[in-house]
Amino acid sequence: MATVNQLVRKGRQKPVVKSNVPALEACPQKRGVCTRVYTTTPKKPNSAMRKVCRVRLTNGYEVSSYIGGEGHNLQEHSVVLIRGGRVKDLPGVRYHTVRGALDCSGVNDRRQGRSKYGAKRPKS
């Protein structure tokens, strides 16, 4: 326990909180251009071909971003919006592309959880 005199001299130090998404620079989303669109395999014990793109952001950062949902229309030079949110089984992928924004289309024939995939309400 610190004495009153020690606290007067120094004060309590606040712990420095490190961001999980440094490339966003405290913004909710950032725009960027795809430099590479590819698939990669997840860590054990999972098995899949996960769709990922490398994005050069407007602030100069280059990051890997996961493309969620079934099927996408992204290719090199597509302009995308990215948000934070890591993919647990893909090391180094700390961002998600926002479906239905800018050049990234929404998921076709999506009926549930549509807002997360930029899908319009189906005509019933």
Curated annotation (Swiss-Prot):
CDD domains assigned to the protein according to its UniProt record, in alphabetical order: Ribosomal_S12
**Keyword Amino-acid biosynthesis belongs to the record:** no
| Key words, A-Z | Ribonucleoprotein, Ribosomal protein, RNA-binding, rRNA-binding, tRNA-binding
Where are the residues of the annotated region Disordered? 105-124
Q: Name one GO molecular function term.
A: tRNA binding
Q: Does the keyword rRNA-binding apply?
A: yes
Role description: With S4 and S5 plays an important role in translational accuracy.
Q: What is this protein called?
A: Small ribosomal subunit protein uS12
